[in-house]
């Protein structure tokens, strides 16, 4: 079974998911492709059979919602803000780091000053935030491994990203993909964490 996912999902959840799945189904061999915005094209072309993505990138595919993960403000450790929550408008007064087609883009005014980072990897953005180059809004999944390097603030108006599994067609999916989808359905039904 060839699956694709974002680097943040690969860091935050995939090891645990694959370990649990392999314990139940050692006969199914897994191949993981870690990519960014290219995942829908990889799914459409058949390069992968299943993609763990956000709902927006699953457009045109059958999508099994699994969990919602909050979007959070990520700022340098010395960012001059006292509270634990921050209005998006205040955050946008700073140089804003984002990648093209990032999930926060639809919520931003078109004239938002930002430094475009041509990277599909949230890790690059987090490193730049840690280096004091600006601020960002990312999925809470993205923060795994960066704790202590950046400061995390809740957004005053909460936003969440719906994550799930996308396949070309539930009916046309192979046995391995259907088995993995059933596993995900059961796993996320028992576990409250995204």
PLM features: residue spans?
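C-terminal regulatory
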Residues: 24, 41-45, 58-133, 142-162, ...
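Short amphipathic alpha-helical coupling segments at ligand-binding clamshell hinges
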Residues: 13, 17, 84-87, 172-186
């Amino acid at each position: 079974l060839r699956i694709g996912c974002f680097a943040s999902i690969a860091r935050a959840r995939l090891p645990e998911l694959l370990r649990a799945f392999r314990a139940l189904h050692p006969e199914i061999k897994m191949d993981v492709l870690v990519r960014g915005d290219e995942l829908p094209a990889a799914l459409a072309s058949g390069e992968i059979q299943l993609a763990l993505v956000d709902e927006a990138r699953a457009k045109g595919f059958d999508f099994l919602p699994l969990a919602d993960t909050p979007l959070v403000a990520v700022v340098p450790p010395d960012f001059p803000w006292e509270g634990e929550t921050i209005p998006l408008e205040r955050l946008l007064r700073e140089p804003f780091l984002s990648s093209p087609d990032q999930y926060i883009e639809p919520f931003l005014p078109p004239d938002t000053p930002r430094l475009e980072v041509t990277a599909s990897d949230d890790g690059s953005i987090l490193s730049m935030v840690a280096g004091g180059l600006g601020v960002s809004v990312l999925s809470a999944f993205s923060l795994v491994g960066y704790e202590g390097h950046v400061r995390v603030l809740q957004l005053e108006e909460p936003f969440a990203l719906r994550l799930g599994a996308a396949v070309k067609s539930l009916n046309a999916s192979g046995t391995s993909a259907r088995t993995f989808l059933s596993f995900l359905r059961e796993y996320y039904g028992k576990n409250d964490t995204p």
